[in-house]
């Protein structure tokens, strides 16, 4: 109640201050106006009077605000000398003890009465530490986030201001300090009352002893208290602790802080009475909370409070997401259920803490929670061995049982993959084929992992209003959403699929195309066989925390049962995700699903892959597509499968992105800089001189990709990436799963494709594989050159190309010669939704960008990034200024291709990662890959 009243008073005060200031200004202006008949000097005097009057009003309001908030001056009182250590016997004086006064340390002689109590006391509150001296400070030298805490007129301890993820500011201090009935915050000699503020989180355990209190912003702002960052302590760290007799008479001491266990810190920093609750500062961040002393060990105690919040995960923001660079050797490894049981059997003792209702168990080096103990982990069957310890012979399929896997390659019992299947709650039932033409789909059952059935968005009123200025907007609208739209569009796209046999010249085309791509080197964890589990875990964690994963995206099926985003799943279930990736990579390398001809349903049942979640992409569609029900579908693979693909194919994809200018695939291409446009244009112009160019448009590319095209792609990946044997097997099995997928709709309905093929648009490999497959298609029909970005391409002209593409199973709806100048040189090309010419790349799909911008509260900078190169940009900016969406210099016209950021094109986001070293491999060939009668490839030695 007290906090609420203070907050309301503060709001009234601010409004009052603003009104009086404006009134004073108006009076002064009126005075100046009245003097208009006088010389200009009198007008200047009137303005000066207005400034002074305004300053007086502001000062009065400031004092009034402090009065309303109950701000008072801190009472300073002399402090007695404090005994800060155990008494020792000195033959000359008797018993003496170290003491401190006014920041100086000295010994005092103890009387017999004091000796009696001091000698029987087990623990002092604070402790002086050798080589850690108190340094007197001016109050301005203390951290802005530090505050003194008073119980009426008595200094009880210290605290700090930290910020939570919800934007709320909290007071962090020791619980035993807060329990002294803290009534005031104090900073620089000013006190403000805070009684009645609620506790948000706390722990009464003596090793933790912290409390988090919700304090209104008004109390912080009137004292000028800043906000500190909270970070996890990293091993042995130099820290500084602050305290004093009051908020103006302050000291600091510096020393080393170390972890005793993941939550308990010991410091060699001198403190004195009344310093409890003071933060441990490392540079400008808080890395711990001072609690008291442990004189028997000659150290002070502190809490690794950031670790406590890392476990709770909801109250405050911890800046450093990784506790140690190498957590495998650091003293803060989180345990799974089985390892925890093993530790108990080994006689390792665990201390139990309670943090806001969450039970934490910790040893000196490891910790877990009661929640985690309910999550079972992989446990080898009796008599078996871990797959990382297998030898070369064990990698064959006959060795599955000794590797603790049943026939089919799925770890059972307490495996991570088994848990994923359990979370999904699959109910399999064959309800027959649901369509009669194209790619057949079978209704296979349902899962318990459901998603929200969203409704179609209405066109925003700002879009409607802009249609008179930009008639092109009339042709756009938002697509339908939900399972009904998904199944309708799926059947429409599937109906156009036509399966064809691999052409006779496929192997020659593969050989010719492969020579145009760079080679790469596998991740180090794959290069050593048999595989080492610890190496895999380290590499997977590196990928997950490198920024490669879109943390806002859905984790897919079945991990959406745990969290709605990748970030949430990684936060609460990372051990499960990481273990599932390790197990899946092993399972993929342990079997050849082609030999069993496993169906999409069986692949999911055996843990080799997860269902592909199908949903309609929320982007503006043409009204023609909406009327046809031909929505753009995203086939989103699960977080686990994405990590599997990144592990296998990341180095090759990264190499191709870094070297986009020297290979046919262009996912790494950017068009935001003139140098990038020039590089692309020079390549196209040179190729055009050797053979005239053509622009082709393949309709529904993802839904027409053939299985033999995917096999060709993975064969080139294996060769170019120098995949070792186990890695090659895992890659082949992953592509088998990719081309034989189980789809899941929003309502949980499961559909299986009955023929192999189709590119999954949400796969990590989509952009890279589509680009290579598109270039392969051009090679197959005899085109002398080709560049491709996904399904977009520019290639050397081929007579009768649409018919030849049709023979490969692809519908080429447009095939046009590139425009040329009178002298025959290339004039321009349409590529990746851009009209590209010498020195210019102009986005052609500007209506979609403007439609999106007008549909919500977007920044003009994001629009400028996409449209600054458009010929319509000037008209767009003028219109936006007219309706008030842009002001000042926002959206100023720039010269061609000087947009502030990269033009958004397929795969361009990945282009800005650090380039990976290309790894030369000599003497490689594709002779081990030959198409069988079914058109599939076989790896020699299987």
From Swiss-Prot:
Top-level taxon: Viruses
Record PTM Phosphothreonine, positions in chain: 339
Any one of the GO BP annotations: proteolysis
Residues recorded as bearing Phosphoserine in the entry: 390
Site (Interacts with viral RNA (covalent)): 324
Location of the region described as Disordered in the Swiss-Prot/TrEMBL record: 888-917
Residues the UniProt record annotates as site (Cleavage): 130-131, 319-320, 397-398
Residues spanning the membrane: 10-30, 41-61
Metal-binding is among the record's keywords: no
Reaction catalysed by this enzyme: RNA(n) + a ribonucleoside 5'-triphosphate = RNA(n+1) + diphosphate
Active-site annotation: 176 (for protease activity), 209 (for protease activity), 276 (for protease activity)
Comp. bias regions, Polar residues: 897-908
Domain RdRp catalytic, residue spans: 691-805
E.C. code: 3.4.21.-, 2.7.7.48
Keyword Isomerase: no
Keyword vocabulary terms for this entry: Covalent protein-RNA linkage, Host membrane, Hydrolase, Membrane, Nucleotide-binding, Nucleotidyltransferase, Phosphoprotein, Protease, RNA-directed RNA polymerase, Serine protease, Transferase, Transmembrane, Transmembrane helix, Viral RNA replication
PTM comment, free text: The polyprotein is proteolytically cleaved into several chains by the viral protease.
GO CC, any one term: host cell membrane
The Peptidase S39 domain, residue ranges: 129-326
Entry's Gene Ontology molecular function annotations: nucleotide binding; RNA binding; RNA-directed RNA polymerase activity; serine-type endopeptidase activity
Name of the protein: Replicase polyprotein P2AB
Organism: Cocksfoot mottle virus (isolate Dactylis glomerata/Norway/CfMV-NO/1995) (CfMV)
Native organism taxonomy: Viruses, Riboviria, Orthornavirae, Pisuviricota, Pisoniviricetes
């Amino acid at each position: 109640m007290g906090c609420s009243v203070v907050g309301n008073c503060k709001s009234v005060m601010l409004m009052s201050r603003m009104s009086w200031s404006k009134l004073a200004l108006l009076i002064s202006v009126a005075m100046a106006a009245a003097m208009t008949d006088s010389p200009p000097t009198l007008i200047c005097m009137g303005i000066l009077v207005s400034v002074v009057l305004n300053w007086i009003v502001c000062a009065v309001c400031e004092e009034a605000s402090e009065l309303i908030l109950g701000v008072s001056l801190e009472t300073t009182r002399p402090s007695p000398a404090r005994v800060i250590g155990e008494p020792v016997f000195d033959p000359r004086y008797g018993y003496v003890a170290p003491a401190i006064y006014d920041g100086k340390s000295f010994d005092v002689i103890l009387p017999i009465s004091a000796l009696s109590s001091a000698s029987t006391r087990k623990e002092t509150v604070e402790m002086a530490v050798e080589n850690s001296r108190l340094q007197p400070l001016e109050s301005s030298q203390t951290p802005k986030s530090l505050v003194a805490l008073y119980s009426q007129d008595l200094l009880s301890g210290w605290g700090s201001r930290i910020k939570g993820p919800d934007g709320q500011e909290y007071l962090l201090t020791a619980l035993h300090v807060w329990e002294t009935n803290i009534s005031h915050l104090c900073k620089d000699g000013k006190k403000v009352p805070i009684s009645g503020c609620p506790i948000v989180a706390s722990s009464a355990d003596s090793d933790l002893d912290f409390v988090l209190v919700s304090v209104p912003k008004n109390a912080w702002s009137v004292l000028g208290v800043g906000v500190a960052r909270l970070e996890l302590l990293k091993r042995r760290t130099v820290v500084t602790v602050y305290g004093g007799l009051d908020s103006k008479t302050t000291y600091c001491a510096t020393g080393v802080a170390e972890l005793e266990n993941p939550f308990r810190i010991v410091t060699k920093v001198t403190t004195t009475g009344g310093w409890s609750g003071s933060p441990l500062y490392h540079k400008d961040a808080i890395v711990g909370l001072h609690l008291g002393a442990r004189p028997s060990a000659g150290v002070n105690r502190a809490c690794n409070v950031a670790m406590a919040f890392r476990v709770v995960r909801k109250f405050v923001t911890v800046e450093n997401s990784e506790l140690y660079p190498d957590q495998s050797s650091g003293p803060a490894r989180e345990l799974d259920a089985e390892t925890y049981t093993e530790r108990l059997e080994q006689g390792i003792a665990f201390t139990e803490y309670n943090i806001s209702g969450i039970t934490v168990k910790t040893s000196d080096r490891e910790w877990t929670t009661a929640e985690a103990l309910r999550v079972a982990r992989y446990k080898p069957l009796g008599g078996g061995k871990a797959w990382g310890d297998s030898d070369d012979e064990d990698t064959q399929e006959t060795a599955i049982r000794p590797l603790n896997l049943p026939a089919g390659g799925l770890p059972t019992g307490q495996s991570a993959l088994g848990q994923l299947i359990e979370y999904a709650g699959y109910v399999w039932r064959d309800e027959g084929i649901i369509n009669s033409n194209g790619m057949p789909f079978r209704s296979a059952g349902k899962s318990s992992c459901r998603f929200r059935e969203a409704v179609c968005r209405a066109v925003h009123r700002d879009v409607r209003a802009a249609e008179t200025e930009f008639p092109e907007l009339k042709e756009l609208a938002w697509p339908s959403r939900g399972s009904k739209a998904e199944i309708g569009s799926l059947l429409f796209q599937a109906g156009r699929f036509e399966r064809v046999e691999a052409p006779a010249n496929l192997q020659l085309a593969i050989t010719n195309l492969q020579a145009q791509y760079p080679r790469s080197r596998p991740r180090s964890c794959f290069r050593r066989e048999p595989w080492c589990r610890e190496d895999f875990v380290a590499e997977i964690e590196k990928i997950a925390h490198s920024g490669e994963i879109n943390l806002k995206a859905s984790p897919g099926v079945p991990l959406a049962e745990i969290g709605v985003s990748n970030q949430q799943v990684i936060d609460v279930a990372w051990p499960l995700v990481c273990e599932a990736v390790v197990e899946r990579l092993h399972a993929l390398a342990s079997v050849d699903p082609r030999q069993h001809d496993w169906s999409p349903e069986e692949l999911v049942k055996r843990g080799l892959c997860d269902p592909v979640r199908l949903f309609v992409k929320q982007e503006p569609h043409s009204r023609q597509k909406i009327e046809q029900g031909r929505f753009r579908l995203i086939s989103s693979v699960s977080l686990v499968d994405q990590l599997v693909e990144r592990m296998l194919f990341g180095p090759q994809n990264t190499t191709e992105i870094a070297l986009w200018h020297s290979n046919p695939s262009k996912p790494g291409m950017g068009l935001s800089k003139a140098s990038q446009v020039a590089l692309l244009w020079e390549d196209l112009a040179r190729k055009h001189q050797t053979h005239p160019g053509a622009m082709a448009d393949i309709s529904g590319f993802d839904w027409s990709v053939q299985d033999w095209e995917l096999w060709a792609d993975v064969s080139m990946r294996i060769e170019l990436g120098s995949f070792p044997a186990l890695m090659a097997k895992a890659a082949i099995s992953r592509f088998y799963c990719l081309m034989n997928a189980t789809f899941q709709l929003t309502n949980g309905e499961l559909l299986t494709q009955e023929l192999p093929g189709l590119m999954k648009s949400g796969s990590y490999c989509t952009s890279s594989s589509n680009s290579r497959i598109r270039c392969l298609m051009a090679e197959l029909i005899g085109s002398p050159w080709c560049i491709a970005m996904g399904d977009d391409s520019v290639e050397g002209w081929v007579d009768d190309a649409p018919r030849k593409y049709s023979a490969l199973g692809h519908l080429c709806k447009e095939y046009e010669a590139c425009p040329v100048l009178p002298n025959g040189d290339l004039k321009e090309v349409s590529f990746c939704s851009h009209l590209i010419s010498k020195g210019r790349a102009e986005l052609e799909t500007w209506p979609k960008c403007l439609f999106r911008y007008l549909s919500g509260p977007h920044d003009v900078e994001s629009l400028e990034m996409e449209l600054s190169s458009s010929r319509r940009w000037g008209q767009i900016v003028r219109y936006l200024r007219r309706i008030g969406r842009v002001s000042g210099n926002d959206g100023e016209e720039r010269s061609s291709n000087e947009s502030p950021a990269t033009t958004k094109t397929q795969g361009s986001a990945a282009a800005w990662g650090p380039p990976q070293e290309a790894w030369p491999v000599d003497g490689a060939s594709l002779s081990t890959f030959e198409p069988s009668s079914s058109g599939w490839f076989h790896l020699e030695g299987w």
